[in-house]
Curated annotation (Swiss-Prot):
Species of provenance: Mus musculus
Signal sequence interval, chain numbering: 1-40
Disulfide bonds: C203-C545, C207-C551, C423-C441, C508-C607
Name the record gives this protein: HHIP-like protein 2
Basic residues bias locations: 672-687
Pfam families linked to this entry: Folate_rec, GSDH
Region named Disordered: 642-717
Family stated for the protein in its record: Belongs to the HHIP family.
Length: 717
């Protein structure tokens, strides 16, 4: 979608909101993230992260504040303890009760998976936790008769009666830091339990789950707010798909507007199907709203906002004949098309338009963005629940800020916008409701800065007078009447060149993330978060990186496709992002990823919900993940290491045999001594060439990417 192309389909200065110069020539998938050696990290026996128990633990009280047991499991462990202790007299109670309680309660330890050697679900689970040698020896001396009551493992039962050393050897862990009770005493392991893990540079370590793939530039993912917990994914070409709570996709699309949507396969084309929003009362009126590029009369390019309805005969299909055009705006250029639609808490529809394109907003004396009579470069607010008296298909809210200003368009809610790419409404803190209703936007910059804004009524966001915190047009910037709203955060193009706005996390599954505004950059592929200081109301940026060993849970991945197109929130409040490895509107390389905090989860059962049933007439397409999980990669690395060690042993043995035979013969020449051993049946490796999606070879680039920049040109002066 993106960049400056000298083609009949694009214009100079044409840049997609999510792409910057010098990237789209990378045809091969570019994945971020890496996997290191598996190291200890908090993990429970169900292979999930630990949590804070919602109720007090009466028995395993050492793990009352954080661990792997809720009250139900705590009571089950207590019942087993008393069942075992019923076999002992009073003296044995005093002697062994503490040991047995300690051992049973290790299921509640935040490091339970390591104590039971259960990090990998493919390996068998221990019957007893790993005990440190001194502790194990003391337990065996005092209470070896209890072992048969604690485990039915025949090897452990046979070993304890003969030799305590043998028994303790079987319970030994390779890393003594994780055996009990050392794991309790290790300050490094317990210092930051329950908070988001950070690497040495302070980067927040999160993980991902792949939930969808094979999409053509997925630009939007929204839910209907109707209790069904479906989500609707829009592709740039104009097709919208329905995904069900079980992860499957319906075979028939919800909406197909390919014949009407204006876009091309060219990387750099920003036009297309750009926005989708469901009416707050969708469950009753079946209405939703779409934002797309189209050709009007005399081939004038327009952006169109329309209302549509869901089919009466199929709740998973739009009625193609129901489209009612709400608003059309002429586009003077093919870029900076905006594209966001959302409903505020006030029930009004907010529309986010770009400044009309080209570079520097060159239209008129002040540009479109500063011209309140233009609908370009604006945040618009309209009432779609009825028509106006003058024949317009919407009403203007009476409290819009410029309703009474001569020359200003009454639909304008805020102005001075360059090209806001992805905005979101904050649900508010789930307990205090703090922040509820705030609207966050990422506004793509020109030459130097990308910014994140909080939208306020009547606000002027500075463009083209300012870019980020700095002046862009010095003459306009010196205007005392500018009175612009500064970004809550801006970053330079050394970090990234095309911001993708995100969401404030308000979900249930990852409570540590509550209140973090998570966003990214299309060009650099960076994931970032903003954290608010409630006292100063200032925001601090935190980098997000994907964990390596911290993501060693079933189903979690630590890599993603580089080009971050959009962010999303499901009906339960969990966060996702949409990305592609090849940003063309017709290339099926887009995926959707869900954020997961591996450091802490919600207590079991807290986040359960029961979706409202929805009838499906279309066949379901089962999701098949393409990304390798961290556990898969670790297993592969382990197998490679084992093969390498085996080959080294085999080669060493062969060399010894050859040496013994050669001692009776003439010494080999220096040339023959350089030959390497190749196993029977193996062939000499040939160079592998991976084709680009277009079937072309990847261009040779110097260390500074000059070849790439020359191919791409610059998307703005």
């Amino acid at each position: 979608m993106l960049g400056k192309h000298t083609s009949p389909h694009t214009v100079p200065g044409h840049r997609a909101p999510w792409l910057s110069p010098g990237i789209f020539c990378l045809g091969l998938p570019f994945l971020l993230g890496w996997v290191g050696l598996l190291q200890g990290h908090p993990q429970c026996l169900d292979y999930g992260p630990p949590f804070r128990p919602p109720q007090h633990l009466d028995f395993c009280s050492d793990y009352d504040s954080f661990g792997c047991c809720d009250q139900r499991k705590d009571r089950r462990i207590a019942a087993r303890y008393w069942d075992i202790m019923s076999y002992f007299d009073l003296k044995a109670h005093e002697l062994c009760g503490g040991y047995i309680k300690d051992i049973l309660c290790q299921e509640c330890s935040p490091y339970a998976a390591h104590l039971y050697d259960a990090e990998n679900p493919q390996t068998p689970l221990r019957n007893l936790p790993g005990l440190c040698s001194d502790y194990c020896s003391a337990f065996h001396r005092s209470c070896h008769s209890a072992i048969s009551l604690l485990t039915n493992d025949r090897g452990l039962q046979e070993s304890h009666g003969k030799d305590g050393a043998r028994f303790c050897h079987l319970l030994n862990l390779p890393d003594e830091d994780y055996c009990f009770p050392n794991v309790l005493r290790n300050d490094q392991l317990n210092r930051n339990l329950g908070v988001v893990a950070e690497d040495q540079q302070g980067c927040l370590q999160l993980c991902l789950v792949e939930v969808a793939n094979g999409l053509r530039n997925p630009v939007s993912m929204v839910h209907a707010g109707d209790g069904t917990h479906r989500f609707f994914v829009a592709e740039q070409v104009g097709v919208v798909w329905v995904y069900l709570p079980d992860g499957s996709r319906l075979e028939q699309p919800f909406l197909d507007l390919k014949s009407m949507v204006l876009t091309t396969p060219w990387i750099g084309d920003e036009r297309g199907f750009l926005g989708l929003a469901f009416h707050p009362k969708f469950r009753h009126n079946r209405k939703f709203y779409i934002y797309y590029s189209c050709l009007g009369k005399r081939k004038v390019e327009k952006i169109r906002i329309s209302e549509m309805k869901v089919s009466l005969s199929d709740g998973n299909r739009a009625d193609p004949k129901s489209e009612r055009v709400i608003l059309e705006i002429d586009e003077p250029a093919s870029n900076h098309n905006g594209g966001q639609l959302l409903f505020g808490l006030d029930g009004y529809l907010y529309i986010f338009t770009g400044d009309g394109g080209q570079a520097g907003d060159p239209f008129g004396k002040f540009g479109n963005a500063q011209n309140k009579s233009s609908l370009l470069g604006k945040v618009l607010r309209i009432d779609v629940n009825g028509a106006d008296v003058d024949g317009q298909r919407y009403r203007v809210p009476l409290d819009n800020p410029f309703v009474s200003e001569p020359g200003a368009h009454p639909a304008v809610y805020a102005y001075g916008v360059r090209n806001m790419w992805r905005c979101a409404v904050d649900r508010g803190d789930p307990v205090t409701h703090r922040g509820r209703g705030r609207i966050f936007c990422g506004d793509v910059g020109q030459n130097k800065f990308e910014e994140v804004d909080l939208i306020v009524k009547g606000g002027n966001y500075g463009w083209r007078a300012k870019e980020g915190f700095e002046c862009y047009d010095k003459r306009l910037c010196r205007n005392a009447s500018l009175d612009d709203i500064l970004p809550i955060y801006a970053y330079g193009h050394g970090v990234g060149k095309s911001v993708t706005g995100g969401y404030v996390y308000r979900g249930c599954e990852s409570p540590n993330l509550n209140g973090l505004y998570i966003f990214g950059d299309f060009m650099s592929g960076r994931l970032m978060a903003l954290q608010e200081d409630r006292k100063t109301q200032k925001w601090t940026k935190r980098d997000i990186c994907l964990g390596n060993s911290t993501c060693a849970f079933p189903g979690l991945i630590s890599a993603y496709s580089r080009f971050i197109i959009s962010f999303a929130e499901d009906e339960a409040g969990e966060l996702y992002f949409l990305a592609t490895s090849y940003p063309s509107a017709y290339a099926p390389h887009g995926s959707i990823y869900k954020f997961v905090d591996p450091s802490r989860r919600a207590p079991p059962g807290k986040c359960k919900y029961k979706p409202v049933p929805v009838k499906t007439k279309s066949k379901k397409v089962r999701f098949r993940p393409l990304a390798a999980t961290v556990l898969d990669l670790l297993k592969e690395e382990s197998q490679k290491a084992a093969r390498k060690a085996s080959n080294a042993t085999f080669t060493s043995s062969s060399d010894r045999v050859a040496s013994q035979k050669g001692s009776l013969k003439k010494p080999a020449s220096s040339r023959s001594s350089k030959k390497t051993f190749r196993r029977p049946g193996t062939k000499k490796k040939s160079r592998v060439w991976s084709p680009r999606p277009q079937g072309k070879r990847k261009p040779n680039l110097d260390s500074h990417g000059v070849g790439m920049r020359q191919a791409a040109g610059r998307s703005h002066p």
